[in-house]
Amino acid sequence: MIITRNSTTPDALRETMSTTQSMFRVAAIQMASGPYVQANLQEAGRLIELAAATGARIIALPEYFAIMGMKDTDKVAAREKDGDGPIQNFLSGEARRHRVWIVGGSVPLESSQPGKVRNSCLVYNQEGKRVARYDKIHLFGFDMGQERYSEERTIEPGNSVCTVDSPYGKLGISICYDLRFPELYRAMGDVDLILVPSAFTETTGKAHWDTLIRARAIENLAYVIAPAQGGYHVNGRETHGHTMIVDPWGVVLDRLPRGSGVVVAGVNPTYQAKIRASLPALTHKTVRQW
């Protein structure tokens, strides 16, 4: 497996961050996206503006924020070339307009297979420059009762772990079903914030969402920002919601059970450093396969 580490922060700034970084706000957006890209982008823009108004420096959108189609192949029809398209232009423009870092949930990008897409989380800095791309590695498959999902039919999996340096610490990027594979997060190394844009079903979400999010925060001693789809969708799907931000001790700082909205919380690097010093579990790893 390839590990991609995106470094956009100058060495001098990283040294300054290690000694002087103070608290900052982050925001996670919850949506109930529909089949029309332009309408979804309009709603995402409204919510980004609300999040930016709180002073959030990192704003994260949920998986499939731009399209939750009537059928799985709708996202293939809406796919974009890497680096060009209305969804990518929207993300870059919003980051630049509000002077914030934006984690763009997931965007359907062209893949090597014509009938499939890459489900890609794109990260933009405050200048609107894309600084990271993560292609979802683990593809959701579920068959229980009347519910059947098989992402592999329309998505080509990625094969690279993704981290990116930011003025706010090192970010580890993942998407939804990745949550069930803790080895992915170990492969990231020591990250300060974990991003998990998601669209958990109501069935799996009510059973496992809270546990998985808090577990990833606790075992990595990291903040977890988990924007989600939450509610009933035009295509008949019901998503769990419960967008949340969790601290390195596993405490849920804020959450939104259902519907469109914004979750905001403060990130305290000093608090995180103290927790890691008190419980240095990351230095106690003895299995070195990662």
Features from the language model and the residues they span:
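Short beta->alpha transition motifs characteristic of CBS
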Residues: 67, 73-74, 122, 133-140, ...
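CN hydrolase (nitrilase-like) catalytic-core segments centered on the catalytic cysteine
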Residues: 82-103, 170, 176-263
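Residue-level recognition of beta-strand->loop/alpha-helix junctions
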Residues: 30-32, 62, 135, 228
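Cys-nucleophile CN-hydrolase/nitrilase-fold catalytic domain and related Cys-dependent amidase chemistry
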Residues: 2, 37, 45-127, 202-222
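Active-site catalytic loop in hydrolytic enzyme cores
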Residues: 80-83, 112-189, 202-211, 276-281
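A conserved C-terminal secondary-structure "cap"
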Residues: 272-290
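N-terminal active-site segment of His-dependent metallophosphoesterases
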Residues: 10-58, 195
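Short beta-strand scaffold segments in enzyme catalytic cores
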Residues: 104-106, 120-123, 162-164, 243-245, ...
